[in-house]
């Protein structure tokens, strides 16, 4: 039975696990779409959702405190600035559900289930077709 089991361990120490999730959070905020294994994507989702909510709460008021709080959590000023300046404006009218997990088959080497985790409502670069 899974009583009182909160998170996955990923066969890592707690410091390694937190560093991995922190790096994945920063990558997702910067690139807005990353590919990883399905369990890692499922574990990453609540961390990113909470960071975006913090950015939304402190966007209008207490901006300096909000930036300092995000920098203390994710240790990356560029990602914290993007959370406050870009993502909090984009998700101003959305109450949660900022990420999407798309299953992406299996990895060739070890058949691990892969997934793409991305931010919803992101800008997609379009390529024009010349009609050829």
UniProtKB/Swiss-Prot annotation:
Which molecular function GO terms apply here? Answer: structural constituent of ribosome
Transport found in the keyword field: no
The protein's UniProt keywords, in alphabetical order, are: Ribonucleoprotein, Ribosomal protein
GO BP annotations listed = translation
GO CC: one term?
cytosolic large ribosomal subunit
**Got any disulfides in this one, which pairs?**
none
Subunit architecture: Part of the 50S ribosomal subunit. Contacts protein L32.
Instruction: Name the family.
Output: Belongs to the bacterial ribosomal protein bL17 family.
Query: What name does the UniProt record give this protein?
Result: Large ribosomal subunit protein bL17
Species in which this protein is naturally found: Ehrlichia canis (strain Jake)
* Gene that encodes the chain: rplQ
């Amino acid at each position: 039975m899974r009583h009182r089991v909160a998170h996955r361990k990923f066969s890592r120490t707690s410091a390694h696990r937190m560093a991995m999730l922190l790096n994945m959070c920063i990558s997702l905020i910067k690139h807005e779409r990353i590919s990883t294994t399905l369990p890692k994507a499922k574990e990453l989702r609540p961390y990113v959702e909470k960071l975006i909510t913090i950015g939304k709460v402190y966007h209008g008021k207490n901006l300096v405190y909000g930036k300092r709080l995000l920098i203390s959590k994710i240790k990356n000023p560029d990602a914290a600035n993007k959370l406050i300046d870009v993502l909090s404006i984009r998700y101003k009218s959305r109450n949660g559900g900022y990420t999407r997990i798309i299953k992406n088959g299996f990895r060739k080497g070890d058949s691990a289930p892969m997934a793409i985790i991305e931010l919803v409502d992101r800008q997609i670069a379009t390529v024009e077709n010349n009609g050829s």
